[in-house]
């Protein structure tokens, strides 16, 4: 059985500790996101590290299994739509502005290295969402059984922050479907409480 290295580190964006586990010692960095209601250890419990043991042992791939917080935001029906979208955006910023740089450090990545993302169910949504909004940071995404239409969870995508989190709302075949609305959403950074907002980048 492949043994991973466990980490529990403080997230300034989320104001809490977040857990993740790393498998392998080198290779292409892959950020793995859990399914709906899942945790970082689900990938190990379902045998994924063992399934790619050869790639991990040969230093071709390094797997980083992140934790999720869907139950607190996206799936929390007790919160209003806007607040759920705000929490989802904070999680996105955690993945892209905090965890991704940490992954590249642990990977001893060369300058310019980009991360791959992978996920199942809502994890696929997070994986693809990260790739679409931060293509300079993520090389590609593998979404398995993904849920990309978030209206089933929080209704229409009329709110600017909701739009910012919904791939089917902000993209069409040839690019961004509603550029003015998305531009407005990207300007709305006051809800993300980090000391260096410029680190977030823009879509």
Region annotations inferred by a language model:
Residues 1-191, 195, 199:
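Non-catalytic cap/lid and distal C-terminal segments of serine-dependent acyl enzymes
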């Amino acid at each position: 059985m492949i043994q991973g290295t466990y980490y529990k580190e403080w997230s300034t964006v989320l104001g809490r500790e977040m857990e993740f586990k790393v498998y392998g010692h080198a290779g292409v960095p892959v950020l793995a996101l859990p399914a709906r209601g899942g945790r970082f250890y689900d990938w190990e419990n379902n045998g994924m590290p063992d399934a790619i043991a050869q790639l991990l042992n040969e230093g071709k791939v390094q797997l980083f299994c992140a934790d999720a917080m869907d139950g607190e935001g996206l799936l929390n029906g007790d919160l209003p739509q806007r607040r759920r979208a705000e929490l989802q955006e904070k999680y996105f910023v955690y993945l892209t502005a905090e965890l991704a740089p940490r992954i590249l450090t642990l990977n001893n990545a060369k300058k310019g290295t980009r991360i791959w993302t992978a996920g199942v169910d809502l994890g696929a949504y997070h994986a693809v969402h990260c790739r679409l909004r931060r293509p300079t940071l993520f090389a590609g995404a593998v979404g398995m059984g993904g849920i990309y239409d978030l209206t089933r969870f929080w209704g229409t995508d009329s709110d600017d922050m909701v739009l910012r989190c919904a791939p089917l709302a902000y993209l069409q075949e040839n690019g961004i479907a509603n550029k003015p609305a998305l531009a407005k959403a990207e300007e709305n950074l006051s809800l993300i409480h980090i000391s260096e907002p410029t680190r977030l980048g823009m879509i």
